[in-house]
Amino acid sequence: TLLASSAASDVYKRQSIRRQSEGIYAMFHYLNYEQKYKRHHPDWEQRLKKMLDMFLQLQNPDGSFPRKFHDDFTVVDGSGGSTPSATLPLVMGYKYFKDKRYLSAARRTAEYLEKELISKADYFSSTLDANCEDKEASLYTATATYYLSLITNGTEHNHYASLTRKAAYFALSWYYVWDVPFAPGQMLGDIGLKTRGWGNVSVENNHIDVFIFEFADVLRWLSKEYNEPRFSDFAEVISTSMCQLLPYKGHMCGVIKVGYYPEVIQHTNWDYGRNGKGYYNDMFAPGWTVASLWELLTPGRTENILLK
């Protein structure tokens, strides 16, 4: 089967194309790292091949992937908003295994993205829980077409680059270019948080977070590709701003332990039922925040793999 979800909630018991994609993506980064030191893992290579082959079975005729499904591939949620998350491991699989089937599948995802998301400016349902317009769909779409532009040439490269620019502009509309005011006594204001450079999550989840991963790299690449310094300038704003809440001795930012980074940063009066504006929600997933910042702080990872 594909990678199993470990969360207890029923919404997470169903398989998610994004969760599976991110797991495969992480393993490709691991295998590429190991290759540099002449270490090989044929067992993991076979597992990844098997999983990517299952991706090929799961892909719809229009190039999309269902958002959620069961182990037997019966579809639970046929929404295609999570499709771009699958593009990344497909491109990496093509590069690693030299299997053109994976590149063909990745190209088909781009056809779907262009027709249903980019041309309509309708980026939806990429997050694991919310079912609405969200930042992550446009961010993932920009990243997906960025991957394809890196491994193609000529007219095809230019086309994917153009799609990347369009999706990136939309993704940037979720990011703050001003600092939300906080009242005296609200923790986020008292510690001096500046919201400029942070992204709102979605229509349903109205808080800011550090979901960025490779998007800063995408912006820097676009800046060079189109000689447009605004992209790299804002990547720098994001990079500096999102490190504000990293806890260390003497700068714990309301976090009790070093090594944790809050997920739900409540910058509005949107009612989550916990703590309110100016505070963290005490229900949060600590893992992905660290992974996102790790990628932000290690620029060039994908280009080092796809362009070598």
Tell where the protein language model's regions lie, with residue ranges.
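Terminal, non-catalytic domain-edge segments
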Residues: 1, 147, 151, 159, ...
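Hydrophobic core segments within long, regular secondary-structure runs in both alpha-
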Residues: 1, 21-28, 42-56, 84-87, ...
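Extended, amphipathic alpha-helical scaffolds
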Residues: 112, 126-128, 187-188
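Short coil/turn linking the two alpha-helices of tandem helical-hairpin repeats
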Residues: 31-38, 94-98, 149-156, 223-227
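Solvent-exposed loop and edge beta-strand segments that line ligand/cofactor-binding
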Residues: 10-24, 37, 67-85, 122-143, ...
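Single conserved hydrophobic/aromatic residue that forms the stacking wall/gate
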Residues: 2-8, 12
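A short secondary-structure junction motif
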Residues: 54-66, 113-121, 171-178, 182, ...
